[in-house]
């Protein structure tokens, strides 16, 4: 586990330095200020750790970590960063997905994106009733007509769609309450809704408060990868390692 984390750290920092190599060389005094955007997730720790060690300064960079609570928020404030990371769904549902270039793929967060319910939910009474989804709890009748709290334009929204599809349902069969993760969790704790769809670290908060997982992205065959991206206008003129592609074409 430690070796894997360190390997990811060194690999990611090497990628970042490769992207900004020409810039850092040209701006030795003072360091080149590099605005970046992050969510409260694992990948943020990697770059935070590198900054704590002063590795950015060693390469002529001053990396600024701007925090956002969701991918939608991060994408909506794209003018505040040139390199960032979030799930694919917020990028692809943004008004201008062609603005971003994918430069790397981070964690598979399929287990951290979850549909969560209260311990007494009828959904938990049945498991594996849906053919092809052995780890999925509940049946269509347990879900139909229920109120689901889910942040819009997020990996949670993608999971919600795939979760309903697994039951043979659509968004027309349930009541969807589009609320951001933090206020959504608070509302759920206070008794609103029948289920809530979250990603880490908010799914961890739900677990700490006794909520149960009725489904994950993995259990409904909906992979969720973190994408590392750069503003295309920033990345294009910089000579570095070949990118993984642009969001204007096929992407993960």
Residue spans for each PLM region:
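Basic/polar N-terminal segments that are highly enriched at the extreme N-terminus
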Residues: 1-2, 23-28
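Pocket-lining segment of extracytoplasmic ligand-binding domains
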Residues: 183-252
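Single-residue recognition of alpha-helix capping/boundary positions
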Residues: 5, 173, 239-240
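Bacterial N-terminal signal peptides that target proteins for export
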Residues: 1-10
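Bacterial N-terminal signal peptides
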Residues: 10-22
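A generic, residue-level signal for flexible/boundary positions that often mark functional hotspots
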Residues: 17, 50, 137, 228-229
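Short, glycine-/small- and polar/acidic-enriched structural segments
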Residues: 27-170, 175-178, 194-200, 216-222
């Amino acid at each position: 586990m430690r070796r894997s984390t360190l390997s990811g750290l060194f690999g990611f920092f090497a990628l970042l330095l490769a992207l900004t190599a020409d810039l850092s060389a040209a701006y030795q005094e003072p360091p080149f200020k590099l605005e970046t955007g992050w969510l409260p997730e694992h990948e943020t720790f990697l770059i935070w750790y590198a900054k704590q060690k002063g590795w950015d300064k060693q390469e002529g960079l001053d990396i600024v970590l701007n925090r956002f609570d969701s991918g939608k928020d991060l994408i909506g404030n794209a003018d505040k960063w040139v390199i960032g990371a979030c799930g694919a769904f917020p990028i692809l549902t943004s008004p201008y997905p062609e603005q971003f270039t994918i430069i790397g793929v981070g964690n598979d967060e399929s287990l951290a994106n979850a549909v969560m319910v209260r311990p007494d939910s009828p959904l938990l009474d049945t498991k594996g009733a849906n053919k092809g989804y052995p780890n999925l709890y509940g049946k269509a009748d347990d879900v139909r007509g229920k109120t689901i709290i889910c942040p819009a334009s997020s990996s949670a929204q993608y999971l919600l769609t795939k979760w309903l599809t697994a039951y043979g349902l659509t968004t027309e069969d349930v009541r969807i309450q589009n609320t951001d993760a933090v206020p959504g969790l608070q509302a759920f704790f206070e008794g609103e809704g029948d289920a809530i769809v979250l990603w880490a670290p908010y799914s961890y908060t739900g677990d700490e408060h006794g909520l149960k997982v009725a489904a994950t992205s993995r259990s409904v065959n909906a992979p969720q990868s973190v994408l590392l991206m750069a503003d295309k206008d920033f990345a294009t003129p910089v000579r570095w390692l070949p990118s993984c592609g642009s969001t204007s074409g096929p992407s993960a």
